[in-house]
Every structure is written in structure tokens, then in C-alpha cells.
Amino acid sequence: MEKYGKDFKYEDFIPMWKAENWDPKQWAEIFKEAGAEYVVLTTKHHDGFCLFPSKYTHFNSVEMGPKRNITGELTEAVRDAGIRMGLYYSGLIDWQYANDPIFEDDDLFGTASPTFAYADYSYNQMKELVDDYAPSVFWNDIGWPTQSEEMMPYFLAHYYNKVPEGVVNDRFNDRYHDFLTKEYKSGSVNRKEKWEMCRGMGLSFGYNANEGDDKLISVPDLISLLVGTVANNGNLLLNIGPKQTEQFRKTGKEAEDSWRMAES
């Protein structure tokens, strides 16, 4: 309110985003140096803004904001670096289709898949991502719209036909998965099944300018988390949300350097 005023809308941020400093090749080099086996990009989160061109919405980074296909550019750079590319998609929640305000955590799920129109939209966009980018990992979030539950097998069949070696996570309404996910959680795991630990560098997945370095996971704790995860047949998916300058926090680079030294 103090900085932008009461009439400023979420969508008003989009023209301010130019992505002038974004270099997908540099990102891919950092991922490769860190020893990443795969990368997962958030193509659309709960706000509904897409980082790829879509036949189903103008609310995307090619027609608005930076006027760039973030998904396509990073996919090409990551694959050129010899790393598998995965895509995240918020399948059940899209606030462009919801009108109810969110005051607490429970309200978040009250906005999930509010209409049949959104269920169709979500299905079509998921297929669009598979057709255009053939991701090695399809990371669906929250769940699958119940209004189009019968379309889930068709989507999964389409994905595996397009990407025979591809894998999907466990957020397809518990009906099918190639690996389980744990998000900011610890505790016992089933070592007989493949799983993935997912968390951010700090307390949030996106970059938070008000989140100080004291809130970030320390280098020793990060290495301990990685070793413990891999030793229990899991993978670590570490979210490293960039700053508004498209650059990573210094701490993220320090963790990468420390891990390389620990390997040598």
C-alpha cells in the first residue's frame, strides 16, 4: 500500500518485468557446475501467469512483460548443457479463474479448480507443454481438476507416448506416480520407492527481498540434506528463485562451491 497505492493491481507488475539481465545459458552453466542431473522450471504457478506462449491465454511472458519465451529458452540451454529438463505446472489452482479472497491457508484450496472451463484450460495447457517441450519430468502441483478426472489417463498416455523415458510426480490425485514428493518435510521414507525432497533456499519458493540471509539454509545443512536424501534413494530438488535482476543470491553460489569442494 505504501509503495504502490491502493489501486495497484497484481497485473500491474508485469510491464515492470523486462528480464534484461536474464541469461539462460549462464543459468545452465551454474546448474551443470553444481552437478544437477535435472532442472525443473515453474512454467505457471498459482497466479496463472505463464512463462511460455500459449494458444489458450494472452497472460504469458511472450505477449506481456519481457516478451520472451522463458520456458523455451531455458529448456534449450539446459539440454545443450547435457541436463534433463523438467517442467512444473500448477494444475489445480489458477487465481485467474478464482474470485474468492485468500485470508488463510485453508482458503488456498477453496479456490482450487473452480470451474469446468478451468479444468479444460488446465488439460489443454498441460498437453501444450508436453507437445512443445517434451519434458523429462512433468511436475504437477496440488492435484488434477476433479471436473476432468476422466481425462487424466488420456493426458498420462499422451505424455508417455511423447516422452517414453519421462516421469511424473505424485500430485495426480494419488492415482498414479513415478516418484513421491516431500516438500519442506523430514521423517521416514520408503527406500524401496523413488522419491524427491523439494524445498527452497529459504522459507519461501520465490525470491523474498525481506527474507534475510539468516533465514536461508546454511551450507553445512544443505550438504547434509543432500547426502541424507540421496542415501535414502531420493533426489533433492532445490528451489533457487532469482532476484528481480534475474541473478541468484550469493549464498546459493557459496553452497554450490562448497559442495564441489566436498566432492573433490
Where are the regions that the model predicts?
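Mature catalytic domains of secreted/periplasmic carbohydrate-active enzymes
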Residues: 1-264
